[in-house]
Amino acid sequence: GENMLDKYFNYRQHKTDFKTEVIAGVSTFLTMAYILFLNPVILADGGFDFGGVFTATACATALACFICAFYAKTWPVGLAPGMGINAFIAYGVCLGMEYTPAEALGAVLVAGVVFLIISLTPIRAWLINSIPKSLKLGIGAGIGMFLAIIGFEIMGLTADNPVTLVQLGDLSNPLLLLGAGAFVSMIVMEKKGIKGNIIIGILVFSAIAWLTGVGKFNGVVSPPPPMTYLFEFDLGAALSASMVTVVFTLFFIDFFDTAGTLTSVANVAGKIGKDGKIQDIDKAMLSDSVSTVAGAMMGTSTVSYTHLRAHETRGNLVCRLLREKK
């Protein structure tokens, strides 16, 4: 019961309790839930099967949160397929370099294994401590800009131009107006501290799109699609010389995005010791790398940490259970 959880998670030591953990878990789920919809949409543009990625995303996120909850239990973070690195896989690897989804998943798997090996060696600490904090944070900012450009193009705010490369889209496009409305509403809700602002914005404006005929309504409940790419990764192609750059890029983004997120969380959560070292970072890095390997086997892109607010402690287990129910 509650006493057993208290004993395992050391609620008193971390100045929290069961009620706080449940609230944190629900808040975490609401913050992360949009990934369940967005990850399949992005990867589908690169040739992945939408339904297969949807199920793989749910299962990989559930497993990753479980691993973090029971192994890296002192970290107030959740894990899910990373937004940004999935766009690189879809638009850079699959569309740009013309690799198949199976080959891309193989590259994700190899990058995850490299991450896992480094996480088990002293190289991990050397890499984290040798990279300037500005670069760690800059990687996240760069990924955010990359995502913004993709989002603007999908919603129609920008369009291709053979001369200037990018031009302003059709401002009378209903899809653009709905997208802009959703974006502004999410920002307003974020400023007001409303939990789940992203998923609320997605659901509300999706409903508006369905009612106005801009979007197609496909129902509310259905059996979960099969995991199309379960153990369907192409390891041979991923180990070829032509994929070295892809594997390195995937590893680089995942490793330093994780390092930046954990450094930021550690600063707020008081997990940096007097010697400047981050407490239990080895467990956090191992959880991330193992989750990435498992996610690639299930058929989704690189799994990474989601940055949560400092007062949200270890709601990972509740997050996992809610994700399973969904």
What are these regions (language model features)?
Residues 2-15:
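Short, Lys/Arg-rich, polar N-terminal cytosolic tail immediately upstream
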Residues 14-26:
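N-terminal membrane topogenic signal
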Residues 14, 43-59, 249-305:
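Membrane-embedded helical hairpins/re-entrant loop segments and their flanking transmembrane helices
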